[in-house]
Amino acid sequence: MRPLLEMRGITKRFPGVVALDGVDFELLPGEVHVLLGENGAGKSTLIKILSGAYRPDGGEILMDGRPVEIRSAAEARRLGISTIYQEFNLVPQLTVAENIHLGRQPRRFGVVDRGAMERAARELLERLGIRVDPRARVADLGVARRQMVEIAKALGLRARVLIMDEPTAALSEREVRQLFRIVRRLKEEGVGVVFISHHLEEVAEIGERVTVLRDGRLVGRVSADAGRDELVRMMVGRSIEEQFPRRRTEPGEVLLEVRGLGRRGVLRDVSLRVRAGEIVGVAGLVGAGRTELARAIFGLDPADSGEVLVEGRPLEAPGPQEARRRGVGFVTEDRQGQGIVPPLSVAENLALASLERYLRGRVLVDRGRLLRRAREIVQSLRIRTPSLEQEIRYLSGGNQQKAVIGRWMLAGSRVLIMDEPTRGVDVGAKVEIYELMNRLTEEGAGILMISSEMPEVLGMSDRVLVMSGGRITGELPAEEATQERVMGLATAGSEAAVG
């Protein structure tokens, strides 16, 4: 069978970096070809070349056996190439229907036909099994539903080649099943899918072949049913003996206590404790209230009732500034939207939460001392960046995430609320983040970890709190926590209204 898409000897250089070095890739009609590699391996550069964001410095691209040049995103779309990026490409102020049809709205007598646009959007959403009102503003949707709208938008373009960059990162298990059903339907129609994922368990389930990149080079191409150990070895160049290297420490004093926290419509009478030296995991289905709990504790979304205590004392004026001042840090689930400031440098992003700690007098920042400490953090966390002055937007997702965590280390936080700490992070970087979490707890910090990845919750938590319907439905010590028990608690009372 002739390939639908071929990339031969693709090379791309940036100042001081060879991002791609003679990489080959091919995609057959109706094939799901999985692209694997650590952050910084070259995956993002490869798909940006295919989507028209970058132009290669060498090599050629063929569609249906004919050479093509992809000079822009519009040209990629004209060739039938559509990309769903890991970070959202939606306009929050517009409705779901407007985002799905952006740039190609149906018109009648020269005017946008909103009825036709909303009907078409509704049909597409129903095809995907997404329960979202096409008239809803994207800004009012959670991360999972925004991701599904992004997928609907791309599929609405009727692409022949669909590039999916971490499409399942923000989805629940049920939503992943829905997505996979749609992908299989696209395969039957002859659409080729380039599927990028860090979830190795998805590879054999959805893919036919796997191409692995490392440090900008092609490591090899294997069948999707290759074992996990082989794939990990190809990705990182070494074996990972233990994916979740949790080192248990003896819990100390209570650092964070939440008493009867409530917020109308999302949280109901939530109480919990986090001690020094422990990781408390929070599990639950999408919509259970986990992120809302994290934001309420940190003061981003004020609670209607209850209180938050840090080291035994209530927060005097609940809010992010007070929480930060008292030693609480927050790693958001939305890295691009709320975690980093893309135009600022790595050093500036690291310093965002701790400038007052480096003041000389009342106004001037001791830049030398701050940069020395920031450099220590970068080296300690192995953040791959040409310099501290590099704009953080040019770092890979994994290095950006390590910088967000490093920000709170620089601030000296003793309590860390981590919402999806390894979302969009590759296997090797995940282990580095887990080791960092171990180090923080060994140094006396307490971590409240919210995660949609069940193996992560079970593998890294000392205790697991399970949420459903805005309340905590159960608590399990690590030795008693199983996927079955967690899921049982996660579905308990999920239909109950939150008061």
UniProtKB/Swiss-Prot annotation:
Subcellular location: Cell membrane
Species lineage: Bacteria, Bacillati, Actinomycetota, Rubrobacteria, Rubrobacterales
Organism: Rubrobacter xylanophilus (strain DSM 9941 / JCM 11954 / NBRC 16129 / PRD-1)
Catalytic reactions of this protein: D-ribose(out) + ATP + H2O = D-ribose(in) + ADP + phosphate + H(+)
Name of this protein: Ribose import ATP-binding protein RbsA 1
Enzyme Commission code: 7.5.2.7
One cellular-component annotation, GO: plasma membrane
Gene: rbsA1
Biological function: Part of the ABC transporter complex RbsABC involved in ribose import. Responsible for energy coupling to the transport system.
Annotated residues for binding of ATP: G37, E38, N39, G40, A41, G42, K43, S44
Keywords, in A-Z order: ATP-binding, Cell membrane, Membrane, Nucleotide-binding, Repeat, Sugar transport, Translocase, Transport
Family: Belongs to the ABC transporter superfamily. Ribose importer (TC 3.A.1.2.1) family.
PROSITE patterns reported for this sequence: ABC_TRANSPORTER_1, ABC_TRANSPORTER_2, RBSA
Assembly, per entry: The complex is composed of an ATP-binding protein (RbsA), two transmembrane proteins (RbsC) and a solute-binding protein (RbsB).
Top EC category: translocase
Organism superkingdom: Bacteria
MF (Gene Ontology): ABC-type D-ribose transporter activity; ATP binding; ATP hydrolysis activity
Membrane topology: Peripheral membrane protein
ABC transporter domain boundaries: 5-240, 249-494
Pfam families documented for this protein: ABC_tran
